[in-house]
Amino acid sequence: MEVNKTTESLFSAKVEHNHAQAESHEPRDQRDVKVFSLGGKSSSKQEKLDHGSGRTSSRHETSRSSKEGSIEDKSAEVSSREEEEENRDGFLSGGNLTAGVAFTDTPMAVASEVMIETNAVTMSQIDLQWVEQLVLSTVESLLVADVDGKQLVEIVLDNNSTVPEAFCGANLTLVQTGEDVAVTFSNFVDQDQVAEAMQLVQQNPEQLTSLVESLKSRQLNLTELVVGNVAVSLPVLEKVETPLHMIAATIRHHDQEGDQEGEGRQEQHQGRQQEKKLEEAQI
């Protein structure tokens, strides 16, 4: 009996030793390590690790945000400095009104074109309504033509209060040949109207003289004035001779003499050439 007990005890001890060795291959730590903070609160090991990782990440985020903030602050400082420099170098820097203004030389061709365009615009702004009113109040029809090198203008005077009654409905014809101008009033209703128009012209010699002088100032000569079938005698303007006029007349006289001498010499030369040709033909 004692031997059996001893054997069983040894066997049980061996079995327990084998279990202990088997368990020793896989060691397990079942302890719960707790960390006590200064505030008197405790936390487990896993919570401590989680808290540590969160703190580390928060530190990284804080450092990253601080770096980004510093970069933004630096860029803001740089931009503010550039704005200050631009304001400092602006158009009114130091009270100089021309600071920052670029002066360029305009080519003469461009300047002349601009001047021509400005003049054209200025001319187009002139009020020509009075011309329209004059034509509408005095002219019924207008004809402008060029006949055999002569410029012809024919106007039918309107029956209006602005036109004298003796000339209402008559045709006014102007013919210009070089510097000479001929004026003709025609197509009257009857001979009585022709007589009235002729009488009106003869009773106003001052106006006729003024007409001749105004045409003369425009380098035009009134050579003929006809009312119906009657030619009006034109006033003769007194020629005022000045030293300049005398010099001009002398120059024209010398030019005419020189032209005549040149023509005579040319004729003599042509005659000699013809004589030579005849002699050569005879030989």
Swiss-Prot record:
It comes from the Bacteria. Residues 1-96, 255-283 are annotated as: Disordered. It holds the Pfam family DUF5421. InterPro entries: DUF5421 (IPR035359). Residues 14-34, 44-81 have a biased composition (Basic and acidic residues). Residues 1-10 have a biased composition (Polar residues). Belongs to the chlamydial CPn_0705/CT_671/TC_0042 family. This is Uncharacterized protein TC_0042. It comes from Chlamydia muridarum (strain MoPn / Nigg).
